[in-house]
A protein has these predicted regions:
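N-terminal glycine-rich phosphate/pyrophosphate-binding loops that anchor nucleotide-derived ligands
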Residues: 1-85, 124, 159-164, 316
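Glycine-/charge-enriched secondary-structure boundary and capping motifs
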Residues: 4-6, 17, 103-125, 134-137, ...
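A generic local secondary-structure boundary/capping motif
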Residues: 33-35, 43-46, 82-84, 116, ...
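Glycine-rich anion-binding loops of enzyme active sites
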Residues: 49-65, 89-184, 323
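Small-aliphatic-rich amphipathic alpha-helix that forms the alpha element of a beta-alpha
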Residues: 68-94, 110-121, 199-211, 218, ...
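Active-site glycine-rich loop that binds ribose-phosphate moieties when present
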Residues: 142-151, 187-208
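Short, compositionally biased
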Residues: 176-192, 314-317
Length: 335
């Protein structure tokens, strides 16, 4: 299977280009749509009863790994993540497939098996899908979840004083980029693949019992891009030495193995960020697009300590990374 340098969430269209297009689209607002384009939410929320809503989202992309089964797992975990990020539990999913007519169908079989295994782990029923012939392989899911209205999690409602936590390490796209030119070890590459395959169901099952004020998943816009979206009405401080970074990712950045997505993120969000550190490689890690990245959690600081301990006990690679502060000149300060 062809390893696409611009695969995974690195293939995402840049935030500036996308925002300009979306702003000009004709819009019709139904009263039962509680979340959509507004606020850059991770999914749409549709109210069904006085208490219950459904959440819909979809994600798909070209491969960023050579193993077809692993690609299926990563794409499915990434698509399901948006549902968890809204505070919902996924219920059903449908496959989205683009596959070359001349390609070996055994590859598609492995991709779909990977996706199906992740859906099974998420206790989500695959109910069908849609496939087309296409010169390049692409795969993902359209997912429906459900939640109680009181459990909705927005991505832009943090409170000043909140603690910030991230549930996966950073640097996957830098490692994928380095691996394509034999500059990243097999061990470091596999650690990135394993991280992308992990479901965000596990941290979600913990955080839903705590006083979480804002929640999103870190994907194509990198940690800094998604935190800029979260820091609405506040600013954030990130402590670089607290971040979990995959082994080899900073070395890839130091060797100038940048990703196109990372540079798009720097262009889109750079004027909202102040770096108080002198570490260009860490800057690249923070802008790096993440595929199937972790959940970014803004939580009451006392609850956050208990949540952190419970996640650690359950083997989740969570890190305390910073805090929300009073609104300031910039959205984010990296210290």
């Amino acid at each position: 299977m062809h390893l696409d340098v611009c695969g995974g969430c690195n293939a995402k269209i840049g935030a500036c280009d996308l925002s300009a297009i979306i702003r000009n689209l004709p819009k019709y607002k139904r009263e039962d749509i509680l979340a959509g384009f507004e606020g850059n939410e991770d999914g749409a929320i549709i109210q069904v009863t006085d208490d219950i809503a459904i959440v819909t989202s979809l994600d798909f992309f070209p491969p960023m790994v050579e193993d077809a089964y692993a690609f299926g797992k990563i794409a499915a975990a990434n698509a399901l993540s948006d549902i968890y990020a809204m505070g919902a539990e996924p219920v059903s999913a449908m496959n989205i497939v683009a596959f070359p007519e001349e390609e070996d169908m055994a590859i598609l079989d492995e991709i779909l098996k990977g996706g199906a295994d992740v859906c099974k782990e998420a206790m989500t029923t695959l109910t069908g899908g849609h496939s087309i012939h296409d010169p390049k392989i692409k795969y993902g899911l359209s997912v429906i979840g459900k939640l109680n209205l009181k459990d909705i999690k927005r991505n832009n409602t943090p409170k000043v004083g909140d603690a910030l936590y991230l549930t996966k390490p950073l640097g996957v796209s830098l490692l994928m980029s380095g691996y394509t030119v034999d500059e990243v070890s097999e061990e470091d590459y596999q650690a990135a693949v394993d991280s992308m395959c992990r479901l965000n169901k596990h941290p979600y099952d913990v955080l839903k019992d705590y006083d979480v004020h804002a929640l999103t998943d870190v994907t194509g816009f990198g940690l800094l891009g998604h935190l800029c979206e979260m820091a609405d009405g506040a600013s954030a401080v990130i402590y670089a030495d607290k971040l979990n970074v995959l082994k080899g990712a900073k070395e890839a950045a130091e060797n100038f193995l940048f990703t196109a997505g990372g540079q798009r993120n720097r262009n889109a969000y750079g004027d909202k960020i102040t770096f108080e550190i002198d570490d260009f490689a860490m800057e690249e890690v923070l802008y790096d697009p993440q595929t199937s990245g972790g959940l970014l959690i803004s939580v009451d600081p006392e609850d956050g300590k208990k949540m952190f301990d419970e996640m650690k006990e359950k083997g989740i690679d969570v890190a305390y990374i910073g805090e929300m502060i009073e609104p300031s000149e910039k959205s984010i300060y990296v210290r």
